[in-house]
From Swiss-Prot:
Subunit structure: Homodimer.
Domain notes: A Gly-cisPro motif from one monomer fits into the active site of the other monomer to allow specific chiral rejection of L-amino acids.
Lineage: Bacteria, Pseudomonadati, Pseudomonadota, Betaproteobacteria, Burkholderiales
EC number(s) on file: 3.1.1.96
Record organism: Burkholderia multivorans (strain ATCC 17616 / 249)
CDD domains per the UniProt record, alphabetical: Dtyr_deacylase
Cellular-component GO terms for this entry: cytoplasm
InterPro entries: Daa-tRNA_deacyls_DTD, DTD-like_sf
GO terms of biological process kind: D-amino acid catabolic process
RNA-binding recorded as keyword: yes
Stated family: Belongs to the DTD family.
Protein name per its UniProtKB record: D-aminoacyl-tRNA deacylase
Motif Gly-cisPro motif, important for rejection of L-amino acids mapped to chain: 142-143
Glycosyltransferase found in the keyword field: no
Amino acid sequence: MIALIQRVKRADVRVGERVTGEIGAGLLALVCAERGDTEAAADKLLAKVLGYRVFSDAAGKMNLPVSNIDGAGRAGGLLLVSQFTLAADTNSGLRPSFTPAAPPDEGARLFDYFVAAARARHPIVETGEFGADMQVSLVNDGPVTFWLQVRP
């Protein structure tokens, strides 16, 4: 399972004109399930996303997780957006292959599981809409972007 996380000042996701998720300071996570991924892999990836220290402490070092973005216990937002293209095989030719991605029904199930688990562990969770054509807007903070991957 893959998450591309970006530290943001703010971010939102829309389907058409409808805002489906919006956060202030926090993390935008583009999330992808790969073939063979399990709920255990989703749990492991979520622990990594929630614990990854990408926010600056008082000394200016990236030392704080999304649950404590200011060092005083204030949680940041977590915007979760499904993006199967993260699993693309780009090793040959000029057209990506999406064979490594989980089939749509399994991808949806694992994304929904990931969202539910995130909501159980973090106070501010917003989402996109699985399988929809979405428009994602964000103001990167840094920029700070990390590729997190957990193998099943």
